[in-house]
Amino acid sequence: SQAPGLHSFICAIALGAIHAGISGVYAYPGTPSTEITEYIQESPIAKARGLHSSWCTNEKTAMEAALGVSYVGKRALVCMKHVGMNVCADAFVNSAITGVNGGVVVLAADDPTMHSSQNEQDSRFYGKFALIPILEPSSQQETYDMMAYAYDLSEQMRTPVLMRITTRMAHSRAAVEVAASGKEVTC
């Protein structure tokens, strides 16, 4: 691996997903999840790989687009804030039944204390309800490392994986060692 660079949770998620081999990211804007998609859109590695990025009509269509990519065996990332889980609930819960082929990670950015939202909500309940694995990283390094694990787990279990972060975590920074193939060291 390379020398550690200073990364936010946002950057660790984006780099982790890119290095895990995603083919596309599908999102509906909402702080702080918007920044993940923006980072991927600007990433030289993502551009070189022709990684698809789409701002969707809503979170449900983002989930459906990611599932479509998964059904042909490719990996996808879905990004939304916590209230978006309400919008994509139908597609999210049913994806536990239909399953996935390529790995799908659903990133939900919860906002305890309503820093930039109209309500508080814990997205983990959707994962518990749908019997979908839930990952909640506690550091930037864990976040980066967990992305590869999340995609492997998704493909092994043939179900999406829910990853939860919070607004305040999203903007904190710490040293992260990225894969040797990764050329982006700081963000």
Where are the model-predicted features located?
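Thiamine diphosphate
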Residues: 1-141, 145-147, 166-173, 182
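Conformationally flexible catalytic loops at phosphate/diphosphate-handling active centers
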Residues: 157-187
